[in-house]
Amino acid sequence: MKNCYYLCMLFLVTFVCTNCEPNNPHVDYKEGEVNQIILSVEDKETLDIIFQHVESTKANDLLNDAEAKCVSFIVRSKTDLQQLAPKRVNVPDLDFENYSLVWCVYESPYLTAKVTSYRMFMQKDGVAQLNVDYKCTSIAAAFGENCHYALFDIPSAAIKYINVDCVQESRNSNN
C-alpha cells in the first residue's frame, strides 16, 4: 500500500511538472546557449523585443556554430503567421489548430560558405510539418534585402543539423 502511495505521488508530480507553462516568457540570449521562448502571439511587446534584438545583432554575436536561437509561438491563424513572418512571406492556407511555430536563426556547420538562415516551421506533436527558409549567402547580407526564401515540405533529413531544442514537443492553445 505504501509503495502504491509513493508511485501515485511520483506520477502526479511528474504530470504536473511536464504540463507547466512558463509564467513570464522573457528574452535572455546568452552566448553559446540555445534559447527557446514559449509565448502567445498576443504578446506583442515580447515579439518586438525578439525581432529588434535579432535584426540589430550581427549574426556572429547571435549564433554559435551549429547552435540555433529558437522561438516557439502559438499560432492560431494564417493572419498570425503572416504577421510573424519576416519579409511578410505569403503563407498557404493551413489548419493551424494545435500547431506551433518555431523560428530559428542558425549558421550551418556543414557548408564551406557562411550561410545564415532564418528557419520557421510548423510543427504538430513535435514533428516538423512545413518549413520556411530564409537563406543568405554571406554574413554581411544576413539581415539585408538580399535574402531569398522558399516555402516547402520539409523531409526529416533537412532538419538533422538543427539543435534538438528547436523541435521540442509542440505546445498549443489547449494546454
What spans do the regions from the language model cover?
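Positively charged n-region of N-terminal signal peptides that target proteins for export
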Residues: 1-5
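C-terminal motif of bacterial Sec signal peptides marking the signal peptidase cleavage site
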Residues: 15-19
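Exposed, flexible binding/inhibitory loops of compact, secreted disulfide-stabilized domains
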Residues: 21-175
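Sec-dependent N-terminal signal peptides
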Residues: 6-14
